[in-house]
Design a protein with these regions (language model features):
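Conserved beta-strand-loop surface patch within small alpha/beta domains used
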Residues: 1-93, 102-164
Length: 164
């Protein structure tokens, strides 16, 4: 395991347990949520499960939203509003998380090209947060990886791992 270290926000054991429990509850769909932490500290302590609205989007317009929640996630407008509002407060959003479910590769905790595109606007991060991707299989959580923006590479890169 590669530990996450400052200045990057590390998940507390309680937040990680909450994320893993959320991922297991949502199987076979991808879960998604936001982790908040104290302003000015590299801690991500309060995991808040969000509703993955991808199935709704897919049902409304399957041409535009070709994937359903088994292979994609989408945070709703209300959750994004709360994320944005938190950035001005004492407990800002530090991490956005989601799961990859039963992927056909050895390690499902990766930041896909779709994830890269969704996390950026005009080649820059959409929000000043990092991302955690959970590798979820039928038999449980295998682990997670954390990704941060690398301005030199102009993309999110893996900075640490959490055990399953």
């Amino acid at each position: 395991m590669t530990a996450v270290s400052p200045p990057h926000p590390a998940l507390t054991p309680e937040a990680l347990a909450a994320i893993y429990a959320h991922a297991r509850r949502e199987h076979p769909n991808e879960c998604c949520g936001i982790v908040y932490g104290p302003k000015g500290q590299p801690i991500a302590a309060r995991a808040v499960a969000c509703v993955n609205i991808q199935n709704e989007l897919h049902a409304e317009d399957p041409v535009k939203h070709t994937r359903d929640a088994t292979t994609a996630y989408n945070l709703g407008a209300g959750d994004l509003f709360k994320l944005g509002k938190s950035l001005r407060g004492e407990e800002p959003a530090k991490i956005v998380y989601h799961s990859h479910v039963d992927v056909e590769r050895a390690d499902g905790a990766y930041f896909s090209e779709t994830d890269q595109a969704a996390a950026q606007m005009d080649g820059e991060p959409s929000y000043p947060v990092e991302y955690v991707v959970v590798d979820l299989r039928r038999d449980g959580v295998r682990g997670a990886a954390q990704f941060a923006w690398d301005p030199g590479a102009r993309r999110y890169v893996e900075i640490g791992r959490y055990p399953g």
